[in-house]
Curated annotation (Swiss-Prot):
The lineage of its organism: Bacteria, Bacillati, Bacillota, Bacilli, Bacillales. Belongs to the pseudouridine synthase TruB family. Type 1 subfamily. Gene3D superfamilies: Pseudouridine synthase. This is tRNA pseudouridine synthase B. InterPro entries: PsdUridine_synth_cat_dom_sf, PsdUridine_synth_N, tRNA_psdUridine_synth_TruB, TruB_C.
Amino acid sequence: MEGVVLLHKPKGMTSHDCVFKLRKILREKRIGHTGTLDPDVTGVLPICVGRATKIAQFLTSETKTYEGEVTLGFSTTTEDASGEVVETKHVDRVITRKEVEGALAALTGTIEQMPPMFSAVKVNGKKLYEYARAGQEVERPVRTITIHEFVLLDDREVFEGETISFRFRVTCSKGTYVRTLAVMIGEKLGFPSHMSHLVRTASGEFLLEDCISFEEIEENVQNGTVESIFISIDEALSKFPKMVVDEKQAEKIKNGMFLKNELQITAPFITVFDKNDRCLAIYEHHPKHPGMLKPMKVLVNNQELKL
């Protein structure tokens, strides 16, 4: 049993909760997720099973797309709807579509962002949420992120009321805190704000419409069709350039054999396959020997090579 499961993560569960539940359903210990989603967030959560856990790091660096909702009028401790109210300021004027689109445009491109106190970012060996739960606030490292697209989904021309909400879609780099973006939007518009709803609609090439629920996974287990829920390792890595080696080279892959970059591939990672179209390893460019590739992750062992 191996491959990537595209889970439609339900609301109220942490990513670790999802891994724990899937281990029980599949009766498989080797399971790991490819990036944390907050409990209140739903949507695409790729989970690696069996030998696929070896490729998890290559799936976490992908860009992510979200659709969500910002509410102006009050902020919270967690920057989302689950936290306690910190500041309230009624929206005492009409907010125009042009203003909202201007705020989104100002946050598009390469920007700096400070992670929220309620996050898993580590400072001095402790996670920020541990400080937050103890009532402490510490200096947080600013990180550089990229917002590839940030668009308003509502078709209204004006927004008004003591609190107002509007929907957005954002495509961003790994490590972006979308709830912090919601706070930053409020700052641009002059009001406290928080993220009132969020769903991840894409993680790299993986889309929400291709995800399955826990109920569907359990149904496949009961029907004996569990293999149908997996995306193969080969398919999950299909975005990387591919090299094919002969049988003799394949046997040496497991020992860390260097390969010549005969195809002059410039992409950072290259998948190496045998003639049976089985992915053996992921290679990268050798930092000291131009034109050579070195293994970054070997996916097969001695026994598997003999099959």
